[in-house]
């Protein structure tokens, strides 16, 4: 996924993880502190000033533009405390286009004035989001933030930071490895092509049985987006040392069962216990 959410308690390392990971793979990193007043995409990409007749650009837009000139270098954009404002307001355009094929990942920046010659990577006032760009959002769970909606969760891979972990020492070499976008894509493709990592018909049947149970008990279902995410994530998860069952558990718990949050009826507890058994 090109959109990842790190969510949980404050002070558990959500902001540190992308910082150190970017350093480890030698990726370009931009931290964007989200503000509570953000309401639309202009807070991220800037706007055209009618008085000065100039575009007031942001560091976010500049970095996105530069990413188009460095297609083999991974660029990470960290939206720090992303839910201090409503994500679906200022990030709506990005949420939509990331659902399309990669060649259609385009954001309209501005309507160009007549006879205006745009920069090379800003054709017709539109900027391409290249596939070497990854968005990472850090999100706290407290009274100062907004609840992240299902629309956002469904389009992202969410990693929970619910517990404080003890310090540990890294065994082995932790020096920078200079991972390029093409090398990363090759690793993805190798994992997806490995038949032993892929979901089998039997795996899908087991998953369907659980899905039917969740629908019957909680009236919760999901669309093809999650099925596509399963086919993409499971092989990569297994290639990293996990199992198919763990990968499905990861997705089900965050994409489907999380929708039960806030329901306290006794039948919910009983149905969940039966599901676990």
Regions found by a protein language model. Give the residues of each.
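AAA+ P-loop NTPase catalytic core and its hallmark functional loops
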Residues: 1-182, 186
């Amino acid at each position: 996924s090109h959109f990842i959410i790190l969510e949980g308690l404050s002070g558990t390392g959500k902001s540190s993880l992308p910082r150190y990971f970017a350093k480890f793979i030698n990726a370009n990193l931009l931290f964007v502190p989200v503000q509570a007043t953000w309401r639309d995409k202009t807070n991220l990409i800037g706007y055209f000033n009618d008085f000065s007749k100039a575009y007031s650009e942001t560091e976010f837009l500049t970095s996105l533009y530069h990413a188009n000139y460095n297609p083999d270098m991974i660029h990470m954009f960290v939206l720090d405390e992303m839910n201090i404002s409503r994500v679906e307001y200022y990030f709506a355009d990005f949420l939509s286009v990331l659902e399309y094929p990669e060649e259609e990942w385009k954001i309209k920046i501005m309507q160009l004035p007549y006879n205006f010659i745009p920069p090379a990577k800003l054709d017709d006032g539109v900027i391409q989001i290249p596939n070497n760009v990854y968005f990472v959002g850090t999100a706290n769970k407290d009274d100062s933030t907004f609840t992240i909606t299902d629309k956002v969760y469904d389009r992202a891979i969410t990693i929970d930071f619910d517990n404080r972990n003890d310090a540990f020492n890294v065994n082995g070499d932790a020096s920078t490895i200079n991972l390029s976008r093409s090398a990363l894509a090759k690793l993805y493709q190798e994992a997806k092509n490995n038949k032993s990592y892929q979901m089998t018909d039997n795996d899908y049947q087991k998953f369907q049985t659980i899905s039917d149970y969740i629908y019957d008990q909680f009236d919760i279902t999901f669309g093809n987006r999650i099925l596509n995410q399963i086919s993409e994530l499971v092989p990569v998860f297994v290639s990293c040392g996990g199992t198919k069952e763990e990968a499905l558990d990861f997705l089900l718990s965050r994409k489907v069962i999380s929708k039960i949050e806030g329901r306290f009826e006794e039948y919910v507890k009983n149905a969940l216990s039966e599901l676990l058994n």
